[in-house]
Amino acid sequence: MASGLFLMSLPNPDHVLRLAQELNLKVHQVASTAQLLAEGATVPFISRYRKEVTGMLDEVQVAAIRDRLEQMKAIDERRASILASLKERNLLNPVLEKSIMAAETLTALEDLYAPFRPKKRTRATIAKEKGLESLANLLFAQDPATDPVAAAQAHVGFAYTPEDGKNQPATVATVEEALAGARDIIAERVSEDKDARARLRRVYQSTAVISSRVLTGKETEAAKFKDYFEWSEPLAKAPSHRVLAMRRGEQESMLIMRVTLPDELAGVAEVEPLFVKAKNPAGEQVRLAVADATKRLLCPAMETEMRLESKKRADADAIKVFADNLRELLFAAPLGQKAVMAIDPGFRTGCKVVLLDRQGKLLHNDVVYPDRQAVEAKEKLEGFVKFFKVEAVAIGNGTGGRETEAFVRGLGLPASIPVVMVNESGASIYSASEVAREEFPDYDLTVRGAVSIGRRLMDPLAELVKLDAKSIGVGQYQHDVDQSALKRSLDDTVVSTVNGVGVEVNTASKQLLSYVSGLNESIAANIVARRNEKGPFQSRAELLEVARLGPKAFEQAAGFLRVRGATNPLDASAVHPESYPIVEKMAADLGLTVPDLMRDGSKRAKIKLETYVTEKVGLPTLTDIVAELAKPGRDPRQQFEAFSFAEGVNKPEDLKQGMKLPGLVTNVTAFGAFVDVGVHQDGLVHVSQLADTFVKEPGSVVKPGQKVMVTVVEVDLPRNRIALSMRSKPELGARMQNGAGTPSSRTGPSAPRGGGTPPPARPAQRAPQSLNDDWFTAALNKKK
């Protein structure tokens, strides 16, 4: 699990210096953080309990240092591998070694290694078999006295045996064959030159165009990609979702995607001055070789690089969107410990009903049929509410959710019992998971799913950590991005959120415990086993009795674990056990006990923090301690507020232009936000419709789970599209052109909420086009 101890090698001084410059930090901040990471400290622990050591670095900065150090380590490992390969083949010289040691990126290393990389048989190697390397060297020198034709004539008739496995003797037949072979040797030399590659790379990075076109004969089959049938735009400005959309079309053999220069001759002109040094016959041969090298070897190599580079950038953008959305969902306000009746709506098989106690324990389950056995369903639900003293009702927002909600509201329950629609994304995946089978081995999938819906209302964080984050449905193109990078980012997000909230050690599941700083799946399971065997923990100190939870793990975890009702009230706070003596001294100096100090704000106000500053404990930690004493174990999540959709609006057909409706943001992407207005398919608020002012990043305006008011701009039932706006005066019914906004929605009961892709923005060379069907991405965004 990502939250376990993170061991790194001791920091390299050169890496520390360079990283301090890159991140604009002081050297001691990077060095201290790197040292803590090397000793096994976690990101949450370092940022929360080692502020004096790091100079107040936050989680983002600590994680950046960790990730960059890993990248630098990977570069060093590749450097060592290259040096070993060159030494083994006796190709290493002092100048080359110095250049390799000075290379700071993998790209620079690979450019240096390119001429020496073992390669397959090429046109240049064939020319060398013909004995033409001396001719290539002669031409490359560009001596005015050199006559290329005469020099080539000397090689005509040269006998050689091609290394093609056939071993049939051959000869150089003509002068042109000799010159062509010499140019091939020069061309390969040019293509492997680090300066040539660097120059052309810069040209591609600044001017390259990404384009796509439909494969001939696939026009009908590829209809979902028709926005990209004939598309081009500057690569440097291409948004991540468009890059990923084109790549997906290519992977599905619908599109051809290219990254090219607007003018290939510009690439040749950039490289040519490095090699063409004279205007004479020999120089002309070199010029021809450079042009060939650029078009045949360098440009394809740069295209491959740019494709990978743009994919990496697009992945990073998409992963950030996913992680940001996930954080908001995990931080969603919890209902808290209340008795809940949870309902998983269904028509054919009925609505599965479960009753949960205040700790989320399953007490009872049943099935009701509001659509065809309304009287019986009403009697059952009313009986459940009364018998189990229900304090809230949770209803899944899937098919039949609004109808079920209307039925429950019609029961006339007390106003003190909120009826809440709960996002059920991922509930079905949880119900079939090993975690669910372990929790409820004697119940079927429908019961497990309903329990998950109820618990998600009570404590979203505790329930969502049981799911694979990718199944929650708040990303864009999550199946197209680098899966290891995605997992790392999402794990970091879960770890950050779990530790930011804190975990009650006596009630937390092993899944939740496994994300606590310093713990892992094995230790978490041992904590639960010890809890089941000997009863609730009475203090944090008792955690040391848990198998495999040693002093280091205790140091990293203790501050994030809460023991409610412990003898020492500090055990229920975020004050780390290592700081207990400080609190005890503060209390003693005021003639108080620790509990008295925690209760009496007027006494705490008298504490002079400077008095307690030591070599290891400074004002940042002391300030945190006093703040925690005021609200021990406080939950940083917002207070729960019930939300209701508009009555009478249950399906897309109920929507009318100009309607103003309450909605819940379900997904935020780079191009806008998807909003649930209670009609079983989400509408899109395009980035241009999020506010009256310009919005660059949708995430700066809206977050998943946020309650918003929207205006219905357009409803296209045949195309399953709903366009919404958050502007104060939206233009109703406007056919929003490229970049202005595109409605998107669920394509049916099984389609995920959100995750669509708008058509690309119009490039200057194309006329405006009408919106096309873009809902396909919503369906593609999850595996079928």
Question: What kind of feature is each model-predicted range?
Answer:
Residues 108, 112, 420, 426, ...:
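Long, charge-rich intrinsically disordered scaffolds of nucleic-acid metabolism proteins
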Residues 202-209, 343-347, 399-403, 422-429, ...:
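A glycine-rich phosphate-binding loop feature that marks nucleotide/adenosyl-phosphate handling sites
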Residues 45, 58-64, 71-342, 346-443, ...:
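Duplex nucleic acid-engaging cores and interfaces of nucleic-acid transaction enzymes
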Residues 42-43, 54, 58-165, 169, ...:
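Accessory alpha-helical DNA-binding modules that contact the DNA backbone or grooves
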Residues 24-25, 333-335, 495-529, 647-685, ...:
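C-terminal accessory/binding modules appended to enzymatic or scaffolding proteins
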Residues 305-323, 436, 471-504, 609-657:
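Long, charged amphipathic helices and adjacent flexible linkers at domain junctions
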Residues 561-784:
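Single-stranded RNA-binding regions, centering on S1/OB-family and related RNA-binding modules
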